[in-house]
A protein has these predicted regions:
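N-terminal core-binding DNA-recognition domain of tyrosine site-specific recombinases/integrases
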Residues: 1-55, 101, 185-192, 210-212
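Basic, Lys/Arg- and aromatic-enriched nucleic-acid-binding interface segment
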Residues: 44, 59, 63, 70-119, ...
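Short, charged phosphate-coordinating catalytic segments
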Residues: 58-64, 112-134, 232
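Catalytic-site neighborhood detector that most strongly recognizes the C-terminal catalytic loop/helix
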Residues: 85, 141-143, 238-263
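Short, basic (Lys/Arg/His-rich) helix/loop patches that form interaction surfaces
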Residues: 96, 152, 168-172, 194-236
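Short, polar N-cap/turn motifs at the start of nucleic acid-interacting alpha helices
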Residues: 129-134, 208, 229-248
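C-terminal catalytic core of Y-nucleophile DNA break-rejoin enzymes
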Residues: 144-164, 172-199
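C-terminal secondary-structure termini that scaffold catalytic or DNA-interacting sites
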Residues: 181-184, 263-268
Length: 268
């Protein structure tokens, strides 16, 4: 789909298969990686698909050489997972802005920040997945990254905002974020979160490019650890496979010396 959109956006869109050459692919990959501000991994995923397509064209005689040859993947060792934490002052600005401009997008931000639910998983949440009495949110295995059901604790701010937005007045089988971020029967991809963040939040609040919608998840984990919530609780809420993953988020400025080791004494 992005390839079709990119081609349509060109001053002279390609029409014939011979125009699908290495120069065109290079420019498309740069568009995905640089202009759309995607990760190196996303860039590699697109290139991998293009390699398969190029192989198909060669196999069936549409071209006389594999046009992706010479375009390399970015090595995994060169891909560093960037975790950008949004500052407290910017979190306040974000909250104040969305309270007046778009409470439903603020709700999506709260779910990402407090429940650590990935954007794609958020897009599949239905009204009936919330258990207000128990204070939990159910994520179904069909849509989670590890393909397991998950029951997460809901922060009171999420419930209060859902009531304020009238979310619980909709049928339980409605998606929480359908067209226009309003509950509805139609599934909408997580792209609408990224688009709103890029075109409205980042633009109007003048956030740096390093601030992405997904940054709220990393910021939420770090904020909980900074608030001295124990690592086990944070690990379970974030669904980390190991406490070692959670420890990566621990801010260095709150790490404290172990008093037992400080006072440890021997004959040496």
């Amino acid at each position: 789909r992005n390839l079709v959109r990119y081609t349509a956006s060109l001053k002279v869109p390609i029409t014939y298969i011979y125009q699908f050459n290495r120069e065109y692919i290079n420019e498309f990959i740069e568009h995905i990686y640089i202009e759309r501000e995607n990760s190196a991994q996303t860039r590699n995923n697109y290139l991998s698909w293009l390699r398969i397509f190029a192989g198909y064209l060669l196999k069936h005689g549409y071209v006389d050489k594999k046009v992706t040859d010479g375009i390399d993947l970015i090595p995994k060792r060169s891909i560093k997972k960037q975790r950008t934490v949004i500052s407290e002052s910017d979190l306040i600005r974000l909250q104040e802005y969305l309270k007046t401009k778009n409470k439903r997008f603020l709700l999506a931000c709260y779910i990402l920040f407090y429940c650590f639910v990935r954007p794609k998983e958020i897009s599949y949440i239905r009204i009936g997945d919330f258990n207000v009495k128990a204070g939990t949110l159910l994520l179904h295995s069909d849509y989670t990254k590890n393909h397991k059901d998950a029951v997460l604790t809901i922060n009171r701010k999420i419930i209060e905002l859902m009531i304020d937005c009238g979310s619980f007045s909709y049928p339980s089988d409605y998606y929480l974020f359908s067209d226009g971020l309003t509950p509805g029967p139609k599934w909408r991809s997580e792209k609408q979160f990224r688009d709103y963040w890029t075109h409205y939040v980042r633009k109007n609040l003048r956030f740096p490019v390093s601030y992405k919608f997904y940054s709220l998840k990393d910021t939420g984990v770090t904020s909980m650890l900074r608030a001295r919530i124990d690592n086990i609780s944070v690990r379970d809420q974030a669904r980390h496979s190991s406490i070692l993953i959670t420890d990566i988020y621990t801010p260095h400025d709150i790490e404290q010396a172990n008093p037992i080791i400080q006072k440890f004494d021997t004959v040496f």
